[in-house]
Amino acid sequence: MKVYLVGGAVRDRLLGIPVQEQDWVVVGATPEELLKRKYRQVGRDFPVFLHPETKEEYALARTERKSAPGYYGFICDFSESVTLEEDLARRDLTINAMAMDEQGNLIDPYQGQRDLEEKLLRHVSSAFAEDPVRVLRVARFASRFHHLGFRIANETRLLMYSMVKQGELAHLIPERVWQEWQKSLEEKNPEQFILSLRSCDALRVILPEINSLFGVPNPHQYHQEIDTGIHSLMTLRASSELSEEPLVRFAALVHDLGKASTPIQAWPKHHGHEEEGTKLIRALCARLRIPNDYRDLAVTVARAHLNIHRVCELRPNTIVKLLEQVDAFRRPQLFHKILIACQADAESCGKTVVYRQTQLWNEILSECVKVTPQTFIVQGYEGKAIKEAMHQSRVACVERIMTSWKSNEK
């Protein structure tokens, strides 16, 4: 029995970046042998074991043979005769198909180290085309390593394009699409996930709602980039510089989804795109089974972002109503996420923008939350009268703040 460190841990060691987790491959062993050594089996479709002390994953070396369409259509062989090279051959990219033995020697049958040096994301073999999830994984790795200068190899992009044309992506299940997309939202350059899918025509199949934004014009006075798809990616990029939270980044990306539904004759204006966007976001989240917290934040940002931007033009009563509608008084941290997504929208154009709306909204909220029911209960207010009195008191707070703010702006 021989044990090898494999995959991402080897890749990241060679890149000199922190190793998040270690995966191991066991060659020349049986499930029974590992169980005798107190490893605990956790794999359902093929033998994966947890080390009795480190709890790291140890998988028996295996080969995979395509037997049916889709992610689960594989027959696995994990017999003792499977070699390390055969196990590495089934992996997606050469940079993920390297191993190290217990002495630290590199085993690299598919030139992964060379591709690391050349900063290429290249498929190991034509077997790449057997698994549609790999298109998503390549896009995710593009988002992870873009800041290091990595790019997708031309032949790999062509293979991905061929998979799209052959309809292989139709076999993707919603959970896997969202799993890879969500992971990409946590990376340094989440916009590269979308760009990579678009470059091989996969975005049209996987995320048609976002793909439809490309080619839709925006008013030039507000968006120098003009194209709504480009603007959405710029907003996503800006949000990734403001927040590491994938919820915020998701909301920033889809905030203008409704503009894809604007009739051509109305371009470049998009009246009502906010509410139209909420419908499309709900449908997208239902289709891909995206968690409710992502959906709810994205819907709120889509609906409210224009009013957030033009706070100085709103009446105090409208401002308080907006804060009530987004539950800002009970959930100020949620409102903070909304503000970040809106700030990303404003700053995405690349101009030197000072988004003072964030400061103003925070000042308004901090004063309004000081208005509590107890103040009015001791005065004898009851029931709905308490709620109305609190509302009016908050409106008065906003009036004072706006008066002071506008006088300072002069």
Swiss-Prot record:
Supply the InterPro entries for this chain: CCA_bact, HD/PDEase_dom, HD_domain, NT_sf, PolA_pol_head_dom, PolyA_RNA-bd, tRNA_CCA-adding_enzyme
The EC number of this protein is 2.7.7.72, 3.1.3.-, 3.1.4.-
Superkingdom classification of source: Bacteria
Binding positions for ATP per the UniProt entry: 8, 11, 91, 137, 140
Gene Ontology molecular function, alphabetical = ATP binding; CCA tRNA nucleotidyltransferase activity; cyclic-nucleotide phosphodiesterase activity; magnesium ion binding; phosphatase activity; tRNA binding
Sequence ranges assigned to domain HD in this UniProt record:
228-329
As for family, the record states: Belongs to the tRNA nucleotidyltransferase/poly(A) polymerase family. Bacterial CCA-adding enzyme type 1 subfamily.
What does this protein's UniProt record list under function? Answer: Catalyzes the addition and repair of the essential 3'-terminal CCA sequence in tRNAs without using a nucleic acid template. Adds these three nucleotides in the order of C, C, and A to the tRNA nucleotide-73, using CTP and ATP as substrates and producing inorganic pyrophosphate. tRNA 3'-terminal CCA addition is required both for tRNA processing and repair. Also involved in tRNA surveillance by mediating tandem CCA addition to generate a CCACCA at the 3' terminus of unstable tRNAs. While stable tRNAs receive only 3'-terminal CCA, unstable tRNAs are marked with CCACCA and rapidly degraded.
Kindly provide the name given to this protein in its UniProt entry: Multifunctional CCA protein
